[in-house]
């Protein structure tokens, strides 16, 4: 039985050996030597074991080379990923710095423009107040001049009282009818003087009252303008505070958006790495291969090639 089995197996073995010799590039002399050495069943089994060991060695070597290539590829991918992440972070930082610089320049320009407007308004108000002060000074000077003029006029009128028509009539009456007495004469003169003075004072008070009313009207107008300017200044302050709050809120939103963007980029990079790892596992496989003579014999030509 053993001999019959050996005769049946030998042609197949010799055929496989010739195929292996042809695929591996063996010479005809080596093929003849191999055929001469595999005549017996024990020698055939021994040779099969040697071939199996060679196949294991080849598979192990191939696995080691594949692992080394995978490690090198992984290291290259990680280095490239780190480089891209660093470049992306650098670009993001540059873009953020540029955006913040543009916002700062815009805010500075707006603040300078508003400051220029406030400065212009202040200068105009200063000129207006200076003019108003000058007008008040001129009005007071006119009042002083007018009072001096009134005083001079009053003195002149005192002189004219003595020479007035009533005094002349009074003297004529004394000449015609006699003197009523020194006491009554003095009383009449005093009464006449008081009447003249009261009339003059009434006229002066009426004029002063009209001037005072005009001054009060001007003061009311100036107070109204002052209140309006104060309200405008308060409105500008509130608007400036609101714009500052909006600027702070926009800065916070920008930082929050930047953090979210960085998280999203990190998540995308992580998903990309997981995708590459899954693809690598799907192509190469992670589990160690079980040695099978039939499967390894079928894969041998592919590996040798």
Curated annotation (Swiss-Prot):
Keyword Membrane attributed: no
Name of protein: Coiled-coil domain-containing protein 69-A
Residues linked to a lipid group, N-myristoyl glycine type: 2
Residue numbers spanned by region Disordered: 13-38
Keyword RNA-binding set for record: no
Coiled-coil regions listed in the entry: 42-281
Native source species: Xenopus laevis (African clawed frog)
Molecular-function annotations in GO: microtubule binding
Alphabetical GO biological process terms: spindle midzone assembly
Function: May act as a scaffold to regulate the recruitment and assembly of spindle midzone components.
Gene Ontology cellular component list: cytoplasm; midbody; nucleus; spindle midzone
Keywords: Coiled coil, Cytoplasm, Cytoskeleton, Lipoprotein, Myristate
Underlying gene: ccdc69-a
Family: Belongs to the CCDC69 family.
Primary localization: cytoplasm
């Amino acid at each position: 039985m053993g001999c019959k089995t050996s005769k049946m197996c030998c042609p197949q073995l010799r055929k496989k050996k010739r195929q292996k010799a042809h695929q591996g590039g063996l010479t005809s002399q080596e093929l003849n030597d191999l055929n001469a050495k595999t005549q017996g069943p024990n020698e055939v089994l021994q040779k099969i074991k040697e071939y199996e060991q060679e196949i294991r060695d080849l598979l192990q070597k191939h696995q080691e080379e594949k692992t080394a290539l995978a490690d090198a590829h992984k290291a290259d991918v990680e280095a490239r990923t780190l480089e891209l992440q660093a470049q992306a972070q650098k670009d993001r930082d540059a873009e953020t710095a540029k955006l913040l610089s543009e916002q700062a320049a815009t805010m500075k320009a707006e603040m300078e423009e508003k400051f220029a407007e406030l400065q212009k308004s202040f200068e105009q108000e200063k000129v207006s107040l200076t003019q108003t002060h000058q007008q008040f000074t001129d009005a007071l000077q006119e009042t002083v001049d007018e009072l001096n003029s009134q005083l001079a006029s009053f003195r002149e009128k005192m002189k004219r009282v003595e020479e007035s028509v009533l005094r002349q009539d009074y003297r004529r009456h004394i000449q015609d009818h006699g003197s009523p007495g020194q006491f009554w004469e003095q009383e009449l003169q005093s009464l006449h003087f008081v009447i003249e003075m009261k009339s003059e004072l009434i006229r002066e008070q009426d004029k002063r009252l009209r001037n005072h009313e005009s001054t009060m009207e001007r003061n009311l107008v100036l107070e109204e303008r002052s209140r309006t300017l104060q309200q405008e200044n308060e409105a500008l302050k509130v608007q400036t505070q609101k714009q500052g709050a909006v600027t702070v809120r926009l800065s916070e939103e920008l930082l929050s958006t930047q953090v979210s963007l960085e998280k999203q980029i990190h998540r995308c990079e992580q998903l990309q790495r997981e995708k590459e790892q899954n693809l690598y596992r799907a192509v190469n496989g992670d589990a160690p291969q079980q040695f099978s003579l039939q499967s390894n014999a079928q894969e041998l030509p592919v590996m040798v090639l």
